[in-house]
Amino acid sequence: MNNDAVFLSIKKICADYTVRLEKISPANFQLIPPIGGWSYSEVYQHIFDASILSLIPMEECIHGNAVKKHTVFAVKLILFFGMFPPAKRFKVPARLALRVKKIDHEEARMWISKFRLQLDADYPLISSADPHLRTLHPRLGYLNASEWLRVIEIHLKHHLKQLKRIEKSF
């Protein structure tokens, strides 16, 4: 998938998150769902916090503050298929898990907006990034700027599925 298609996909996914947000009552937004796990608010805070944090190493690749490493084959498969392996459960890295907190609708809108603004600023620079320069992802190894963009898309899609599961449980 090329960067333009990934970028447009991310914009559509963000729009979907925004539409879904407006349909969730403030009370349900804070509740732990019947299926357990994170509340809607925690999912929103996590996914957009993680997405914003993922822009930082992407920017490092863009600006040449990265190393020449290879992306491992298993990760290339994830990037190609656009999804995490179905049987594999990824545990949130401890440093991100500690950041998860409940937020309200307005804060969720702020997180979405902050991510979209930063992505819009960074995206045009990806094409000038050296594809051989990579920064370390805590679970996937070394990624270049385009691969970071793709991982952001995959992660956003993954948590969109989680929101759908939460919705069905109420």
What are these regions (language model features)?
Residues 1-5, 56-112, 170:
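Short, helix-capping/interhelical loops that line the mouth of catalytic, cofactor-
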Residues 3, 10-17, 21-49:
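Long, hydrophobic N-terminal alpha-helical segment
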Residues 8-11, 15, 45-52, 110-113, ...:
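Generic structural signal for well-ordered, non-transmembrane alpha-helical segments
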Residues 19-28, 87-95, 128-134:
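Short alpha-helical hairpin
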Residues 31-80, 125, 130-170:
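Short, contiguous alpha-helical
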Residues 102, 106-113, 143-146, 150-153:
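Short, well-ordered coil↔helix boundary/capping segments
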Residues 112-131:
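Active-site oxyanion/phosphate-handling segment shared across diverse enzymes
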